[in-house]
Amino acid sequence: MTHPKTRNTLYVEQAELISQDAHENEQYHMILKAPETSMRASPGHFVHMQCDSNIYMRRPMSIMRSSVKNNTIDILYKVHGDGTNALSKKKIGDSIDLIGPIGQPFKMKNYKKRPLLIGGGVGIPPIIFLAEYIKDTTKNLNPFVLMGSEIPFPFKTQPSKILINEVPADVNASMALLEDWGITSRLTSLKNYAGCFNGYVTELADIWLEKLDDDQRKDVEIFSCGPTQMLKAVSKLAKKYNLSCQVSLEEYMACAVGGCAGCTVLIKTENGNEMKRVCVDGPVFEAETVIQFHN
């Protein structure tokens, strides 16, 4: 999987639904044939989808995987209203109007040796995309992926065969696909799922970071996507250990192309605090610049 340099041009295309698999708790994994978007998508990008001809407002959906070879993108979503319910009824071969890829993705120029990827809930898909990107485009990196969910994970899990000395031995649940790629992962939940850390994903991240020595910790950079409160905790964790941290924010969006300014957040810039649009100025920002995380 290779991706050219991110472009600001947005493409409107009629994507064809290739497959759609249902998982527990009304979670769905769809694969769309979308040549223009797949050619340009990077981890952190999203698409704006028309869920049904009778539903005026589009829905923003983060991209979980992108294949230039197959001209496809993967979307993972949960039914949470009329729009996503309409998506769940789509059949193989149906056409879905989408705009993409949108936004500023994760910056991947100066990777440190130990990228720590933290995803929670609907923020899991971009983290999977980033993990795959690191695997396919870099060498000598050792990413560690942590994912938390309070509903059953919408993918195959298994006890990990990759030992992590800094994590309790009984915390061994991993994402099978990441394990196949040779990427270390651990899962967390408050629901006592087998092998999962019984707590918040940031708590397990703290345990891991605390047990690293100073030299190891200097090689860590955090990339995260998830609910606002989780990202706030991730930001505090980065500050505690003096780590670089990029976060992908979640906000309600109307136009998703920068026109309505309905998804603005206060960001610290060189010129002072400014309102930035999550859709096009983000969704990825440096955690230390997000004002709401430091109040």
Name what the model sees in each region.
Residues 2-92:
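Ferredoxin-reductase
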Residues 85-247:
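FNR/FR-type flavoprotein reductase catalytic core
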Residues 282-295:
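A charged, well-structured terminal subsegment
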Residues 27, 41-43, 109-111, 257-259, ...:
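Short glycine/proline-enriched turns and hinge-like loops at secondary-structure junctions
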Residues 126, 228-230, 250-284:
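Local cysteine-cluster metal-coordination motifs and their immediate loop/turn environment
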